[in-house]
């Protein structure tokens, strides 16, 4: 399994629409950087957020998630409350090749401010926006800047194709758009 370089990422984005929209340059002046890098792609966070709240005194249950757990927010800057959590989504829409797995790591700019980003792997055959989990681990409110970088995606190509892709197994988050809340197949 090999880590893919910028030339491969560029080709897959431009010729196979693996990343749309695709930013061929790495933009970093005056913003949290985003776009193509040497061995990855820095994704941007969109303007929509779902901020966890205790206003309704609910319990977070991944098997029975209720919308009252979150407050919808749209804007250029999202303030994540102290010791809190928000969901967001990428601006980019991904179409993963059948022999490629992508992993996502938070950007150091945010990590050094106590902002931890979690994204599960993009499985072979997955298509959709990426839902991003953002934790503010500090005792202070923290800003997240929409339309700027939030994490870096690394692409790993397998030595052979898998028997069953995410698309083949009809994954529960396949072709998701916007922010997708937890789902349990029934």
From Swiss-Prot:
UniProt keyword annotation of Hydrolase present: yes
Gene Ontology molecular function: dCTP deaminase activity; nucleotide binding
Protease recorded as keyword: no
Catalytic-site annotation from UniProt: 133
Pathways involved: Pyrimidine metabolism; dUMP biosynthesis; dUMP from dCTP (dUTP route): step 1/2
SUPFAM superfamilies for the chain: dUTPase-like (SSF51283)
TM stretches of this protein: none
EC number: 3.5.4.13
Primary enzyme class: hydrolase
Record-linked InterPro entries: dCTP_deaminase, dUTPase-like_sf, dUTPase_trimeric
One GO BP: dUMP biosynthetic process
Keywords: Hydrolase, Nucleotide metabolism, Nucleotide-binding
Coiled-coil boundaries: none
Binding site for dCTP: 107-112, 152, 166, 176
Reaction(s) catalysed (UniProt annotation): dCTP + H2O + H(+) = dUTP + NH4(+)
Quaternary data: Homotrimer.
Entry similarity comment: Belongs to the dCTP deaminase family.
Protein name per the record: dCTP deaminase
Species of the source: Campylobacter jejuni (strain RM1221)
